[in-house]
Amino acid sequence: MNKAPINLQDTFLNQVRKENMPVTIYLVNGFQLKGLVRGFDNFTVVIEFEGKQQMVYKHAISTVMPLRPINLVAASQASAEER
C-alpha cells in the first residue's frame, strides 16, 4: 500500500485538458491568455484559442484559473488508478 505522491500541477492541467475546460492563464508580466489546454510537459503548456496554438513556458505563468472548479480529489484518484 505504497501511495505515490500526488502531482497537483499535472493533475490539475490534465483535468482541464480532458474536460476541454476554458482557462485564463495569467503571466508574471500581467498579460492574460484565454483558451483550452491542449498539452503540457515539465516546462511548457500549450493552449489553443480561436484555432491558434501558443506554447507558454511555465516559468512565465503566475496563475491558471479554470472557468469552473476542478474536483481534484476525483481527478487524483483517477490518475492513481491509471498507474
UniProtKB/Swiss-Prot annotation:
Disulfide bonds: none annotated. GO terms for cellular component: cytosol. PROSITE patterns: SM (PS52002). CDD domains: Hfq (cd01716). It comes from the Bacteria. GO terms for biological process: regulation of DNA-templated transcription; regulation of RNA stability; regulation of translation, ncRNA-mediated. Pfam families: Hfq. GO terms for molecular function: RNA binding. HAMAP family: Hfq (MF_00436). Belongs to the Hfq family. RNA chaperone that binds small regulatory RNA (sRNAs) and mRNAs to facilitate mRNA translational regulation in response to envelope stress, environmental stress and changes in metabolite concentrations. Also binds with high specificity to tRNAs. This is RNA-binding protein Hfq. The gene is hfq.
